[in-house]
Curated annotation (Swiss-Prot):
It catalyses: prephenate + H(+) = 3-phenylpyruvate + CO2 + H2O. It is an enzyme of class 4 (lyase). Residues 244-322 form the ACT domain. It is found in: Cytoplasm. It comes from Saccharomyces cerevisiae (strain ATCC 204508 / S288c) (Baker's yeast). This is Probable prephenate dehydratase. Present with 2020 molecules/cell in log phase SD medium. Its main location: cytoplasm. Coiled coil: none annotated.
Length: 334
């Protein structure tokens, strides 16, 4: 019997770093269809509502710029929505969402300065134009700020303009389209990956323009919780990452410390903590926060998970375990 084709969503278009993360995750799977999504919300929504989709790959954080807040907020919103759907009073304060995290991927971010046309003198050719319009994803600007500042100082006679795009790969496509419509004294460039330049048959002016070496983006691999098939996760180590979100009883002094202290009591090492504001509805008070923590457990080490969960339930207002998954070996790469 022929094996089922896996259908995997990623933040498109093709040639993005999200595409690379999806390829890394399923590189050992022979029959995979990679489907570009137009936005991070689509990566969530389509996975939840289209049963033909098996997995979705979304960016979570960058080692230079920090959180990808769209992804954090989409996780937050799903927990809150699920909590509001529970009957009152609910039997438990543990929330079980419709999707779960089953793996992580890390993709080195190596940006290139890309041109739709061949420039005979390379970067020096920029001085021949009155205006240079640079296209890229908003997340990129903070990763190449020093490079762009240096370029502007090198060509003070040139006006540099930045234009946001939905993805790095789309920025190459957009600069190609724009260059055919503008006059000769305007040059359109893009900042994207070498893969994106090759995909769109564009020219790389300069490689590795990142301000910091080792810049990396972390991605989560999601699936529907009722999808009980093979997770397609390559398990190479003993260390597990657990992603848990919770809210506190805001007016109780020390309520956040009480939750975090449970990790110490159970000898669990927390490796990450973040927070996002939330509202239950338009009448809800401001300045309430949902917390994201990640902590380690080991594959073959017995832990009293149920007692840990009981303690979390006792000290938090509501909580959700999004998944337990292997620590990817790329996490340790510099």
């Amino acid at each position: 019997m022929a094996s089922k084709t896996l259908r995997v969503l990623f933040l498109g278009p093709k040639g993005t770093y999200s595409h690379q993360a999806a390829l890394q995750q399923f590189q050992s799977t022979s029959d995979v269809e990679y489907l570009p999504a137009a936005s991070i919300p689509q990566c969530f929504n389509q996975l939840e509502n289209d049963t033909s989709i098996d997995y979705s790959v979304v960016p979570l954080e960058n080692s230079t710029n920090g959180q990808v807040v769209f992804s954090y907020d989409l996780l937050r919103d799903r927990m809150i929505k699920k909590a509001l759907s529970l009957p009152a009073p609910a039997d438990t304060n543990r929330i079980t969402p419709d999707i779960e995290v089953i793996a992580e991927q890390y993709v080195p971010i190596t940006h290139c300065l890309i041109s739709p046309i061949q420039l005979p003198n390379g970067i020096a050719s920029l001085g021949n134009f009155e205006e240079v319009i640079i296209h890229s994803h908003p997340q990129v600007w903070g990763q190449v700020e020093c490079y762009l500042r240096s370029m502007a100082e090198k060509f003070p006679q040139v006006t540099f303009i930045r234009l946001d795009c939905s993805s790095t790969s789309e920025s190459v496509n957009q600069c190609i389209r724009s260059s055919t419509a503008d006059c000769d004294n305007i040059l359109h460039l893009a900042i994207a990956s070498e893969t994106a330049a090759q995909l769109h048959k564009a020219y790389i002016i300069e490689h590795s323009i990142n301000d910091k070496l080792g810049n990396t983006t972390r991605f989560l691999v999601l699936k529907r919780r009722e999808n009980a098939g093979d997770n397609e996760v390559e398990d190479t180590g003993l260390l597990r990452v657990n992603l848990l979100t919770f809210t506190t009883r805001q007016d109780d002094p020390g309520s956040l410390v009480d939750v975090l202290n449970i990790l110490k009591i159970h000898s669990l090492n927390m490796c990450s903590i973040n927070s996002r504001p939330f509202h239950l509805d338009e009448h809800d008070r401001n300045w309430r926060y949902l917390f994201f923590i990640e902590y380690y457990t080991e594959k073959n080490t017995p832990k009293n998970k149920e007692k840990f969960y009981e303690d979390i339930s006792d000290k938090s207002k509501q909580w959700c375990l999004w998944g337990t998954f292997p620590r990817n070996e790329r996490y340790y790469h510099k």
